[in-house]
Amino acid sequence: FAGTTGGSATVYRSTNGGSSWSLVNSGLPSSGINRVEVAVSPSSPNKIYAVYGASNSGFYGLYSSSNYGNTWTQKSTSPNILGWEANGSGTGGQSWYDLTLAVDPNNSNTIYVGGVNIWKSTNGGSSWSINAHWYGANGLPYVHADHHHAGFRPNSSEFYLGTDGGVYKTSNGGSSWTALNDGMNITQYYKISQSQTDTTLLIGGSQDNGT
């Protein structure tokens, strides 16, 4: 399965290792969207999920299929799990830039959607709870914003997120997260300056990760 981007973002399926592709969009949206990510349940390969970003880059909807993508059903359109707020309020988001989707290998109804924050559903996408927040609001676990990839370690409960701030891991379904960034040169500096009175003193401003 593959998802596309743009105003006609949709889902394709290949049954021959990618040599050819067919459109599988019965029940999926065709307007007001900008991107879709797709994930297959490892424990129930017939069950597929698709998360859509809206044209304003907020949450458009979560869709599921139980017949290998032949038909799709909308499961939810709220809260705004692709926005910045811990309670899912507000509009807009960053699906144009960051969007990821993963299915728990041991439970086809447990799914994670990452964008600015990471959200979790335990009922196949019908309802959501925030799993971690981009600056740890309201006592929530902190995970750096902008999630681009998510995946489970085989034969374990370990779940990993790749973000603009490095790699994060949870082993307890998101109750707590650990940064795995020791030794990773991931700080992107936009500006740097040297003191005019002390040649050993430098200051730099980095993307997301401090000054």
Q: Where are the regions that the model predicts?
A:
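Beta-propeller blade termini and top-face loops
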Residues: 1-211
